[in-house]
Amino acid sequence: MQKLLLAVLFFSLLAIATARPKYHKQGRRKGDACRLHCLFDNIVCETPCRVLFRSRFSYHVCARDCRKDRVDCYIGCKNIDANPKAEAEPGSLDKEAGTKGEKEKNGKKEKKEKKEKGEYAIGNAESGTGSSGGSNKTHDDDDDDHDDVYENDDENEE
């Protein structure tokens, strides 16, 4: 029993000390960053179960809550993908920076500054050629929900 408590304490401290990766600052879309956060949280949650329980049944009982949390997290990420207009501009961190017109003006200014400094990530779908105005949409999306823009053919082949 003492070993179990020490192991739980150890993994709790490890989970607290482990910094969650900042996927949204790596140039990823909000939906993708959300799914990666769900995956990271699931791994941190299930690791003590894998280490502590040797039998398959005990492991599944331990990991059941982690899996429920992961499913709920993915459902929340689908809501983020369904409401792309609620997302902030790629350069701004706060969602309520002003009116839509102010955001567009600020986004274009920030984009020009970042382009001059070369701060865009390679392979970022939003970097494009600079003519997209900070959006990864290339055409009217009334007919489909696909917003992905691929910059090279290697990413299209899976």
Curated annotation (Swiss-Prot):
Q: Which cysteines are joined by disulfide bonds?
A: none
Q: Which residue stretches does the UniProt record annotate as biased composition, category Acidic residues?
A: 141-158
Keyword Signal appears in the UniProt entry: yes
Q: Which GO terms describe its cellular component?
A: extracellular region
Task: Report where it is expressed, by tissue.
Answer: Prismatic layer of shell (at protein level). Expressed primarily in the mantle with highest level in the mantle edge and lower level in the mantle pallium.
Primary localization class, coarse: secreted
The positions making up the signal sequence are 1-19
This protein's UniProt keywords = Secreted, Signal
Could you name the domain of life of the organism this protein comes from?
Eukaryota
User: Composition bias, kind Basic and acidic residues: at what positions?
Assistant: 84-107
Name where it's found. Answer: Secreted
Q: Where is this region: Disordered?
A: 82-158
Q: What is this protein called?
A: Uncharacterized shell protein 1
